[in-house]
Each structure stands twice: as structure tokens, then as C-alpha cells.
Amino acid sequence: MSQQKPHINLVVIGHVDHGKSTLVGHLLYRLGFVDEKTIKMLEEEAKKKGKESFKYAWLLDRLKEERERGVTIDLTFVKFETKKYYFTIIDAPGHRDFVKNMITGASQADAAILVVSARRGEFEAGMSAEGQTREHLILAKTMGIDQLIVAVNKMDATEPPYSKQRYEQIVAFLKKFMKSLGYKVDQIPFIPVSAWTGENLIERSPNMPWYNGPTLVEALDTYIQPPKKPVDKPLRIPIQNVYSIPGVGTVPVGRVETGVLKVGDKVVFMPPGVVGEVRSIEMHHQPLQQAEPGDNIGFNVRGISKKDIRRGDVAGHVDKPPTVAEEFTARIFVIWHPSAITVGYTPVIHAHTASIAARITEIQAKLDPRTGQVIEKNPQFLKAGDAAIVKFKPIKPMVIEKYSEFPQLGRFAMRDMGKTIGIGIVVDVKPAKVEIRAKK
């Protein structure tokens, strides 16, 4: 993998069974990141189980299992290259925890591929009130992902196959919805593909002569820009995992969101307030002297044991530590709730890699979702479709920052009853007092 090309974190989103895993698997295979032997083996295995059409999806699951078995400092991500960029696909999608992962994963993504099925009934299911196409688009927008490519998948399964009319119907419907969320739809390519046959992934499909836009890989190189690196901001690394590696020591793993981490730095982990010294940094098994925003790293710290820190903690420099919130004020949008949200309601807040319950202590104002203007002060309750300014008190210590200062740590989703209740951005934080304690 060349480290010379700009690096982009990509998330693949969309409704269950619309072909996300097949698309990623086929792409990896066609770009040469999986060998023929593995594909043949998977084909045999899939045939035996009568699941021939799942071979590329299986490929992804296989890669995932292999990776999960070997304990590596590396983050468990799938990588591939195009002519222009070096991509990491974060969280190759599964079913259950996907929205939860989408919330934590998307906050680290620079761009997204939305996969929608063109098959009759499937597209409609994804756009229904319970549909994940709709939910993932809303989440991606809140999580700050403006760079999007839409793959209109299963074009071989439309009626008739490769139907231009069906493609245009889907594009028109999606454009209208995405526009309402604030996406710049004229800057988003909609590519008719078949993840199963590989059409329009890399080469143009002869079956869709009516389409003259880019293939999926061309679109990745043309429409996506590498993120600008916020190197001048204070260091923030939300922790995803912590390993204790024999002969090495404690190794936290996470993505640098802002600032720069160097070997030899003293870092503090909040909320616990423990301090350690950085002995080494590694990315994709390569040692680094320093890590910058966008780098997914493992770093060995002296003076801290595995039990001192956990997923959801945030590392920063001792002189400008991450903010632990006593309470915070946020602008929220309610996506779904069976009845009404009142003061005292306690959803789980998913921000960066943390998930912590927080109680609503005050509903200050209801807003017009389109303009952000106050339409009612101190409303009694909020329901689906409402936007509001709300004050939260986390049940236990949690790092969260103002969106204006650290967008990556200032966005969140509210979850309850296995669903995303709402999304929000932090407008103000009342910091808690935390003692920073260096171990002798």
C-alpha cells in the first residue's frame, strides 16, 4: 500500500440486503486486493451452502473473521487503492449494530458510498419510515459527511433488466429527499451498477448504453476530495480499543481527529485523567514518528495500564486536555419517538467512540427545523420532526466538545429502544472538574 497517495476513510451505507457487502467484496476482488484462490474457495463454500450469489459478501465476512482472530494493533479495516487515493473502508457493514457503528464509524468517515437496490419493492422498503436508506442518509449528514456517491445497485434485477426508467425514478426520488436534508445533489453522482456482475464498478457496462457518467471507481477519484487536516488544533484521539500486548505494554487504538501526536509526547486520557508517555506509534503495521488527523493508529503508552482506560475515552495533550462535560447544551433534531420527549428523558448519547446515557434537564426552545429560528420557548415536550435546544446531564463522566471547536467530537446521536431517536450538535459545554494524575 502506498502511503504517498492521499488517504480517505470511506463508509458504505444503505438498507440491509441492498448489496453493500457484495459491492465492497467485488470491488476489492477486481482491484486485486483479494486473490483468485480465495474467491474460488469462497465460491465452493457458498455453493455448498446454496448461497452462490453471496460469494463477494462472504469474502468480506471472511476477511472480517480472519482479522478478528489475529490480535493486531492495526485497526480492523479493509483497504484498497485507486489511481489517485488510498482508501480505508471503515466498518464493512453488518446487520445488527450497524446504526450504532454508523454513528461511531461515520464520525470518522471522510466520504460515503450509499448503496440502494433498484429491485422492485427493495428500494421502497429502504425509503419507508423504518427504512435504513433514509436513516443512514440522515445520520451521514449529521455526522458531517457531505461527500457522497450513490450506487444504484441490482440494475440486472430491474423489470425489464437495466431499466433506464427505474434508474431515473430512483434518482429523482433520492434527489428530492437528499435536497431536503441539505445535500448539494448536483455534486453527487448516481451510478447504476450491479455489484453481483461487476457492471459499472470499474468498467462500463454494455447493458446500460443510456448511462454516460463515471463508473464507481472513476467517481471515487473524481468526486471525492481528501479532508483538510486540522493539525493546528489541540490533539484529540477518541479511543476505540485498548490492548495489552505482551512485551510491548498498553496500546490504545483510535483515529487522530485533530492535532498531531509525536513519539515522546505526554498524553492525558479523559475522563479518567491518567497520564502516560508515548513510546511508539504504528499505523497499518508501519512505525510512525508522528500521527496526523485521519490516521488510524495504535500507540504504546508508558505509565498506564489497560484497566485505566477504555473505549470512549479521549486522549489529548496535558496542557490542552479534552473537555469532560458536567452538562452540555445541544441543538437536536428528533427523528423518531413513539410518544413525546419531556424533561427527565434519558437516551444513550453516542458521540465519537463513547456511548453514555444522558438525562434531559431542560428543553429551552423549539426551533423551525428549516431556518433554526425559535418558534416556542420552554416547550413541554418534543415529538418526531421537532428541532430544539436542549440541556443534557451525562449519567457518568463523558468527553464531549463544542461542535464549533471540534466538529468530530461535537456531533452525536441519541439512541433508545434499539432505534435512533435523534441527532444533535453541541453548542455549549459546562466542564466538569477532573484531576489529572500522572503515575509515578
From Swiss-Prot:
Record: residues binding Mg(2+): 21
This protein's encoding gene: tuf
Family: Belongs to the TRAFAC class translation factor GTPase superfamily. Classic translation factor GTPase family. EF-Tu/EF-1A subfamily.
Annotated ranges, domain tr-type G: 5-228
Enzyme category, top tier: hydrolase
Residue segments, region G4: 153-156
Enzyme Commission designation: 3.6.5.3
Domain of life: Archaea
Gene3D superfamilies named in the record: P-loop containing nucleotide triphosphate hydrolases (3.40.50.300), Translation factors (2.40.30.10)
Identification of the protein by name: Elongation factor 1-alpha
Residues in the signal sequence: none
Alphabetical keyword list: Cytoplasm, Elongation factor, GTP-binding, Hydrolase, Magnesium, Metal-binding, Nucleotide-binding, Protein biosynthesis
Location in the cell: Cytoplasm
Catalyzed reaction equations: GTP + H2O = GDP + phosphate + H(+)
PROSITE patterns: G_TR_1, G_TR_2
Primary location group: cytoplasm
Region G3: start-end pairs: 91-94
One GO MF term: GTP binding
Record region (G1): 14-21
NCBIfam families, per database record: EF-1_alpha (TIGR00483), PRK12317.1 (NF008969), small_GTP (TIGR00231)
